[in-house]
């Protein structure tokens, strides 16, 4: 619409003459800049004014055909407009959990002394997630969706409330795919979000004292969503919006208030000392003594032969590894001399100290073994057979890793490293996750998982543990996997000059002193006998590196912070429900004692969108002459809602959590049988091409395969049945025009 159309406004009452009165714009109250006077043009009329014709104006020329058509859809019999108003804890973070994704840990029950939540959040909104928020009494529905199996999504209006002291950044996407990749969590870093093209900065009341206490913004439906009615059951799990946010510190972005330097320090195991990192019994035995558990061959290399031998010579330097404050009590029990490097470094005093320490170690190990058998009597196969991985005397014991050295110039099995986040360019950095059973420290494309590189460490560590857990699909990675790092921007550099692919194992002061990350000073016996570096012990280092980064909230200044987000989702429910009950005469109603009014607010009856489908409710066409048809009764009797009353416990992941990259569960099962058919066909062709002599040589193997063939066929049949059901359902939806864009799901 052109801007000058507003001048031709119709006045009431309608005038008799044809021309409308021209309304000129009012004079501005404020001073405005005037246009420069142009060249004088004569206003003499050069032509005769044409007289307008009465009636409808006629235009000459041939009418062209319309290029596009607007396809309309009939509305259902009943349409109800619903507003879903509620509040969401967008970010809840305790000190020590800055690196975590809050949505992933929102339903965690943390142990005593452990922080809760996370500083970043990455959520995906869908109708099922909104219903789960309703079950937690966090939102209110203005209209009920009961017996209405159709829906339309209109949009959502958000209201981001300003925190008194914490600023935060919000960004969202309406374009599919709504999935997380290896770069999704680290892209939530405040530095990268401020550099992104589209973002919303919600300033705190301390940063911006004036203004409204909230920031409002409206989000339209997804790009690939059609403006039509969908079945609620099919649309319940369809993502409609992906949002991510993080708290930031714009007032002191580069250096925390009250700190002297942005540099931090942590520890790294020396690859020359810890040549084996596996926790398997055979590997542990070989690394400890240089002898295989099933062999009599002995190697000259071994951890205890290098770090803590039973005897030394006058020229050896092995005593320096154990010259710590923890060995002082054993030295004084064995000798009456003062504890210094001259006395401890002599072969006689060192040997007597080792004998005292060895006796204490044997006695203590037997006590630990009995305690483990008492606590876990059924786990006899997992009873420790040696002390090599125990917390008190193992490879990673505080007797060897303690930072309380008498002198920093003595030999140590670790390296103290300093890191400056302002000097990290990112090029050459590399991190990955290895299973604790893996022996080597070098990166392997087949065995190593979740490799990221060429970004600063404070960005790579942001949400990395949550991404590894989501990518691997295991809930026990904190104890079964460890972090490997290569970084040339530390002092000294975490780069092996002989092997550029060899990584370093990082850990903090808590693990070096032999303490638990939580529940300190207590250590469970299951952790005590399996003490080695993993994500649970390395989380402290990741937290320190993340907290020192630019624009990051400093948990040293505040213990916790939380962000609240308000939302107003707009939906339309539709359907053809049964007619309401007949109207009765009020005077004929019986009387009874009036009950006391309740104290709780009355809420609407809201049905689960995932179960609200055309087969689970009655419609108007299900009645004939006031009675339900046999087909409708049979359909409803097949559906049982008894399972809804039994709670299966906490869900595996929150409903707002964004799923990882890849196909959905139903699509994955649908396409699995096609790959199974292709693999079986390829194997049959390869068997037909095999020569006769080769078949006779492998006759025994074929017999074993024949025995396993019925079990494999039954498994393939189950996969085929599940896949065909999904495919046929998609075909029927496509023919009826009820399909949803696969990129949205």
UniProtKB/Swiss-Prot annotation:
Keyword Transcription in record: no
Chain residue ranges for the region called Disordered: 44-64, 580-602, 638-662, 678-699
Acidic residues bias: start-end ranges: 681-692
Alphabetical list of Pfam families matching this protein: TT_ORF1 (PF02956)
Subcellular location, record wording: Virion
UniProt keyword Nucleus present: no
Family: Belongs to the anelloviridae capsid protein family.
Purpose: Self assemble to form an icosahedral capsid.
Record protein name field: Capsid protein
Organism whose genome encodes this protein: Torque teno virus (isolate Human/China/CT23F/2001)
Source species taxonomy: Viruses, Viruses incertae sedis, Anelloviridae, Alphatorquevirus
């Amino acid at each position: 619409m052109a801007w000058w159309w507003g001048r031709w406004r119709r006045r009431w009452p309608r005038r008799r003459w044809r021309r409308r009165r021209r309304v000129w714009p009012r004079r501005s109250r404020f001073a405005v800049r005037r246009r420069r006077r142009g060249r004088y043009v004569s206003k003499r009329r050069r032509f005769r004014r044409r007289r307008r014709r009465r009636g409808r104006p006629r235009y000459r020329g041939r009418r062209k055909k319309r290029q596009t058509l607007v396809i309309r859809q009939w509305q259902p019999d009943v349409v109800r407009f619903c507003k879903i108003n509620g509040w969401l804890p967008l970010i809840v973070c305790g000190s020590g959990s800055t690196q975590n994704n809050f949505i992933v840990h929102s339903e965690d029950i943390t142990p005593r002394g452990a922080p809760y939540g996370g500083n970043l959040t990455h959520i995906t909104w869908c109708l099922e997630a909104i219903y789960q928020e309703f079950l937690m009494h966090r939102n209110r529905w203005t209209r009920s969706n009961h017996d209405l199996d159709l829906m339309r999504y209109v949009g959502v209006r958000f209201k981001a409330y300003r925190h008194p002291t914490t600023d935060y950044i919000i960004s969202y996407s309406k374009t599919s795919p709504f999935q997380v990749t290896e770069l999704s969590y680290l892209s939530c870093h405040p530095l990268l979000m401020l550099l992104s093209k589209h973002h919303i900065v919600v300033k705190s009341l301390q940063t911006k004292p004036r203004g409204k206490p909230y920031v409002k913004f409206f989000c339209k439906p997804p790009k690939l969503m059609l403006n039509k009615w969908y079945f609620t059951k099919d649309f319940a799990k369809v993502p409609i919006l992906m949002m991510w946010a993080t708290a930031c510190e714009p007032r002191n972005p580069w250096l925390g208030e009250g700190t002297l330097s942005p540099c931090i320090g942590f520890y790294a195991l020396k690859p020359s000392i810890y040549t084996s990192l596996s926790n398997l019994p055979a590997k542990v035995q070989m690394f400890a003594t240089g002898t295989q558990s099933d062999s009599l061959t002995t190697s000259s290399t071994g951890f205890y032969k290098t770090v803590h031998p039973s005897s030394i010579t006058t020229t050896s330097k092995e005593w320096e590894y154990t010259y710590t404050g923890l060995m002082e009590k054993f030295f004084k029990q064995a000798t009456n001399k003062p504890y210094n490097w001259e006395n401890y470094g002599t072969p006689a005093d060192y040997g007597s100290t080792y004998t005292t320490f060895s006796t204490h170690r044997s006695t203590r190990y037997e006590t630990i073994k009995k305690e483990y058998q008492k606590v876990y009597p059924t786990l006899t196969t997992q009873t420790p057979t040696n002390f090599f991985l125990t917390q008190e005397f193992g490879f990673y014991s505080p007797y060897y890793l303690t930072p309380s050295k008498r002198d920093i110039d003595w030999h140590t099995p670790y390296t103290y490293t300093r890191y400056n986040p302002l000097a990290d360019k990112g090029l050459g950095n590399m991190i990955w996750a290895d299973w604790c059973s893996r022996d080597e420290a070098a990166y392997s494309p087949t065995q190593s998982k979740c490799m990221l590189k060429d970004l600063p460490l404070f960005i790579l560590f942001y949400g990395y543990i949550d991404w590894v857990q989501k990518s691997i699909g295991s809930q026990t990675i904190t104890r079964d996997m460890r972090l490997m790092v290569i970084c040339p921007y530390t002092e000294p550099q975490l780069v092996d000059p002989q092997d550029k692919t060899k990584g370093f194992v990082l850990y903090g002061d808590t693990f070096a002193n032999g303490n638990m990350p939580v529940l300190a000073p207590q250590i469970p016996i299951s952790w005590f006998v399996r003490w080695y570096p993993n994500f649970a012990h390395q989380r402290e280092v990741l937290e320190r590196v993340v907290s020192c980064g630019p624009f990051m909230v400093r948990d040293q200044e505040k213990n916790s912070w939380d962000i609240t987000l308000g939302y107003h989702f707009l939906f339309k429910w539709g359907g053809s429900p049964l007619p309401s009950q007949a109207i009765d005469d009020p005077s004929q109603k019986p009387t009874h004692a009036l009950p006391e009014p309740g104290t709780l607010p009355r809420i609407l009856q809201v049905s689960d969108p995932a179960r609200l489908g055309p087969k689970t409710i009655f419609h108007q066409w299900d009645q004939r002459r006031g009675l339900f048809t046999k087909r409708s009764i049979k359909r409803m009797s097949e559906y049982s809602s008894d399972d809804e009353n039994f709670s299966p416990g906490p869900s595996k992941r929150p409903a707002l959590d964004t799923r990882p990259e890849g196909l959905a569960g139903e699509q994955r099962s649908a396409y699995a049988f096609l790959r199974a058919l292709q693999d079986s066909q390829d194997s049959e062709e390869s068997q037909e091409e095999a020569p006769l002599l080769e078949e006779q040589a492998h006759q025994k193997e074929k017999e074993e395969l024949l025995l396993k063939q019925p079990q494999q066929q039954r498994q393939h049949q189950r996969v085929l049945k599940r896949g065909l059901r999904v495919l046929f359902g998609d075909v029927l939806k496509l023919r009826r025009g009820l399909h949803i864009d696969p990129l949205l799901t």
